[in-house]
Amino acid sequence: LQSMLRQNGVDAVALGPGPHMAYIADVHPHADERPCLLIATPAGAAILMPELNADEMRRQTDLPFFTWSDATGPQTALAALIQSLGIEKGTKLVQVDETMRADFALLVIEALGQPKTAFAAESVGRMRLSKDEAEKAEILRNAEIDDRAMEAAFAAIRPGVTEREIADAARAVFEEAGATPLFTIVGAGGNGAFPHYATGDQPVAV
């Protein structure tokens, strides 16, 4: 990441809790209203960490923490983090995590003096598009689980069975394989026309 930032003239990238942070640092903080940010430059990295979560998160990384409490707010700790990384106000280009909360992004932008901004998809996102052999194997393994789950769902379909029962059959395949599906959508009859339908108790009709 730091090499990519250097090559593309990016002064810093700020990541919030979520997939980007997990990919770069293998850190998985709880995503809530308290600002938690991984900020990286071509030369270093550090984390703005709520004091409430610091002890737990210390088990996941040895990156420097700049902690803050609800009593003090994050601004002073963020300023210290920025100074420690040598980021100056008037920085030309900062990438922000396109998936993080807007108030987190605004906090960073304000602290850095309103620099030009872009999305971290241009750096971290590109890195995540490149898969190593282990990641490719994991994708194939998950695709195979998906296929088995679909077969189980089709096998469960018969008159009188509810959408939820069919979804449970598919979910059981994931659970048996040690996987956790994000969601299952089963829509009987006219419900099948709804692209984001919430699986319910409608029975399958002949």
Give a label for each model feature.
Residues P74-A179:
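Flexible, acidic/His-enriched mid-domain "rim/lid" segments that flank
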Residues P17-G18, P50, D97-T99, A120-E122, ...:
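Fold-independent oxyanion-binding glycine-rich loops
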Residues M21-A31, A121-R126, S130-E133, V161-V206:
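Short catalytic-site patches enriched in acidic/histidine residues
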Residues I39-G44, L112-G113, G189-N191:
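Short acidic-glycine loop/turn motifs at beta-strand connectors
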Residues L1-A80, E144, G200-P203:
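N-terminal accessory/capping or targeting/presequence segment of soluble
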